[in-house]
Amino acid sequence: MKKITIRDILKMKGKKKIVMVTAYDYPFAKLVDEAGVDIILVGDSAGMVVHGLPSTIPVTMDMMLLHVSSVARAKPRALIVGDMPFLSYEVSIEEAVRNAGLMLKSGAEAVKIEGGSEMVDVIKALVRAGIPVMGHIGLTPQRYLLLGGYRRRGVKEYEAEKIIEDAKELEKAGVFSIVIEFTAADIAEEITKEVSVPTICIGSGPYCDGQVLVLHDLLGIYEEIPPFAKKYADLRRIVIDSVKKYAEEVRNGVFPERKHYFFSKRREAEK
């Protein structure tokens, strides 16, 4: 199968729904790629679902580079997008370009940046440097403190207008796609119609050019998931039951079975 590129994603606009999912390591990158996703997002959500952090704010570049390189070693057909963590691109344009470059050197094929019109200069600089950029508007988790929490966006008119304007500004700046998070569905629909690049929704309705979910949410690894997510499996229960079964067999002397071990020649001679 041919490797998916930025050009392929752009061609899917309005024609074929884009499927994006997060993955943070080699084995899950292999599995989701085998499932046929179009984009693997190495999200800073790893901080919460993998490392147990309370938010994405403490996530560092070193953490993200480790996850990106692990995913890249899976050599997926899907496009690999690395999430730029908090304060890796806001301090200066030079630092943003340097950090985004490290993402690509670690195996990412594009980077994702949160923010609207205030990020235009950074995005332009990255694109000039040859770094593909995915935008992210609506609910931007790295700014949840400023936004007053993880709340719905675009319900009020002034918010809706700002999000629509942000999308247009990001398009002009050169992004190849835009994630729209936890935003009113009609606003996401309007944006999708007005911009020429693909939009990818998460909690923003069915009208975008694609959808994205956090892998741990759709697999049901945790009991609680965001209101816009859907569990397609109950992996939490599968893991618990499997380990319980293993523990039971160890304690009852059932595991290991004869096929799981061998003897030295000394034991064979004793026979």
UniProtKB/Swiss-Prot annotation:
Chain sites annotated for binding Mg(2+): D44, D83, E114
Localisation: Cytoplasm
UniProt xrefs under Pfam families: Pantoate_transf (PF02548)
Cofactor, free-text remark: Binds 1 Mg(2+) ion per subunit.
Record: active site: E181
Enzyme Commission number: 2.1.2.11
Single GO MF annotation: 3-methyl-2-oxobutanoate hydroxymethyltransferase activity
HAMAP family associated with the record: PanB
Self-association and partners: Homodecamer; pentamer of dimers.
Family classification: Belongs to the PanB family.
The protein's name: 3-methyl-2-oxobutanoate hydroxymethyltransferase
Organism encoding this protein: Staphylothermus marinus (strain ATCC 43588 / DSM 3639 / JCM 9404 / F1)
Gene: panB
